[in-house]
Swiss-Prot record:
Region (Disordered) residue spans: 257-286
InterPro entries: NAD/GMP_synthase, NAD_synthase, NH(3)-dep_NAD(+)_synth, Rossmann-like_a/b/a_fold
Assembly behavior: Homodimer.
Official protein name in the record: NH(3)-dependent NAD(+) synthetase
Basic residues compositional bias, start-end: 277-286
Organism per entry: Aeropyrum pernix (strain ATCC 700893 / DSM 11879 / JCM 9820 / NBRC 100138 / K1)
GO molecular function: ATP binding; glutaminase activity; metal ion binding; NAD+ synthase (glutamine-hydrolyzing) activity; NAD+ synthase activity
Catalytic activity: deamido-NAD(+) + NH4(+) + ATP = AMP + diphosphate + NAD(+) + H(+)
PANTHER family registered for this protein in UniProt: GLUTAMINE-DEPENDENT NAD(+) SYNTHETASE, NH 3 /GLUTAMINE-DEPENDENT NAD + SYNTHETASE
Assigned EC number: 6.3.1.5
One CC-aspect GO term: cytoplasm
Purpose of the protein: Catalyzes the ATP-dependent amidation of deamido-NAD to form NAD. Uses ammonia as a nitrogen source.
Pathway(s) it belongs to: Cofactor biosynthesis; NAD(+) biosynthesis; NAD(+) from deamido-NAD(+) (ammonia route): step 1/1
């Protein structure tokens, strides 16, 4: 496939944000009504994704049906994140609670004989933090009769930048249709303060954790590459020429996508047809 045009971030973000807002809020409203649940519960970190998810949920079903949980770990979460999260939940007028997960994390790692130290176990302990937050969200959802609202975006979904059964655990995922760069613009439009809408992204799974530093390229670059591949259907090998981005960066995104395919799939199991070949015939069947 010969690519005779240039793809830029302008192409990615050139969408009807008011139309997108209406479509997502209508989806959230109808889904909740069909489920019979009483509302939505979500984690709010003070970052752009959870801020937009909160704003859309309130827009869709009203502040009285939304519960926000702020779940810092005092060992790794900057105070500014907690302050930003509190500023948001108060401005949207939703029921909320601040739950420090650090004591829970400490109980886990003190009980695990395989644990060595925070530095050597940085990634598994970081993912443990995400899974603890998911457990708390589902506890609240179960107790309050609500659905867990996911906050991950399409960029993170396609490159697997999330914790399996952690921040990906949810009943509804309204933002997996939007790239990070689109999320930022919609967030600002819907009323999220600009300093939060454009705050550098971080899962805060360990001290000093910054998303773009870990990934090795910016979300703007990631979005242009993903948009080229999955929306414009440009082959991976043609994307450097179409975007002007380094081949190494395109290859990095391709590898992230392919290596994380298991995160976007249900658990693997043996083929049922093969197993049924070994079934015994029912008694009396002729």
């Amino acid at each position: 496939m010969a690519v005779n045009y240039k793809v830029s971030l302008d192409d990615v973000v050139d969408i009807d944000y008011n139309g997108v807002r209406q479509a997502i809020t209508q989806f959230l409203r109808k889904y909740l009504e069909a489920s019979g649940a009483s509302g939505y519960v979500l984690g709010v970190s003070g970052g752009v994704d959870s801020s937009l998810a909160l704003a859309l949920a309130v827009d869709a079903v009203g502040s009285g049906r939304v519960t926000a949980l702020i779940m810092p770990d005092r060992e790794v979460t900057p105070e500014r994140d907690v302050e930003d999260a509190l500023r948001l939940v108060r401005s949207f007028g939703v029921e909320h609670a601040v739950i420090d997960i650090s004591p829970i994390v400490m109980v886990y790692i003190s009980a695990l004989p395989i644990f060595e130290d925070e530095e050597k176990d940085r990634v598994p302990v970081g993912n443990l933090r995400a899974r603890i937050r998911a457990n708390i969200l589902y506890y609240y959802a179960n107790k309050l009769g609500k659905l867990v609202l996911g906050t991950g975006d399409r960029s993170e979904y396609l490159i697997g930048y999330f914790t399996k059964y952690g921040d990906a655990a949810c009943d509804v995922a309204p933002l997996t249709v939007l790239y990070k760069s689109q999320v930022r613009r919609l967030a600002e439009l819907i009323g999220v303060p600009r300093d939060i809408a454009y705050k550098p992204s971080s899962p805060r799974l360990w001290k000093g954790h910054e998303a773009e530093a870990e990934l090795g390229l910016s979300y703007n670059e990631i979005d242009v590459i993903l948009y080229s591949r999955f929306d414009l259907k440009i082959p991976w090998e043609e994307i450097p020429r179409a975007t002007g981005l380094e081949r190494a960066k395109v290859e990095r995104v391709r590898l992230l996508h392919e290596a994380s395919s298991h995160k976007r799939s249900p658990p693997a199991s043996p083929d049922l047809g093969e197993i049924k070949k070994h079934y015994k015939q029912h008694a009396g069947k002729k």
